[in-house]
Amino acid sequence: ITHFDLANNYGPRPGAAEEAFGQILRSDFAGLRDELIISSKAGYYMWDGPYGEWGSRKYLIASCDQSLKRLGVDYVDIFYSHRFDPDTPLEETMAALDHIVRSGRALYVGLSSYNAQRTREAAAILRDLGTPCLIHQPSYNMLNRWVERDGLLDAMDDLGMGSIAFTALAQGMLTRRYLNGIPGDSRAAQGKS
């Protein structure tokens, strides 16, 4: 395994997963940074206030800086916009991603959970800025095939964009855990997706 996919909000508290991985990176993977692909994302809730989530330039750049600090690295290989923000102009969100690459905080940018139309629009903005959109991270599995119905797979193919799906096992629904009903301690029993 050489790809470690994180987000600023992952963990039992926001940022905890990046902190834990940063410790592992320093102890178990010391000297191997150039052999690893480390990605992070921003877009979900991190702190109170008007700039604590979504896709504003202020939030994305601050989130990236905080992620780099928690990870203890100078850059991430891929930085994603974790979700489309309906209240921030797409041009602002993509300009922030472009700035993150141009400032050396990330080598590449990607999108997560954007539909086909927004993906095409975002990729065009990034292309015009000179920063290609490398990859998309949608939820995709046998029980959740929205990317096919939406046309996202075709959009990614047309754009030459790669895909790295999340929830490939449908939050555990495609594992043995649910063969005998819904376990009481499961995400499904708690009403979580």
Predicted regions, residues:
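N-terminal binding-site loop/beta-alpha segment at the start of enzyme catalytic domains
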Residues: 1-36, 40, 102
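Glycine-centered flexible beta-alpha turn that most often forms the glycine-rich phosphate-binding loop
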Residues: 4, 76, 109
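Short amphipathic alpha-helices and their capping/turn segments at secondary-structure boundaries
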Residues: 18-32, 64-69, 151-160
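Acidic (Asp/Glu)-rich catalytic clusters
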Residues: 24-37, 68-72, 98-102, 123-130
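A short, structured active-site edge motif that brings together acidic residues
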Residues: 33-46, 137-140
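Active-site mouth loops of central-metabolism enzymes
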Residues: 45-61, 82-88
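Active-site groove signature of glycoside hydrolases
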Residues: 68-88
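Beta/alpha (TIM)-barrel catalytic core signal, keyed to glycine-rich beta->alpha loops juxtaposed to Asp/Glu
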Residues: 84-193
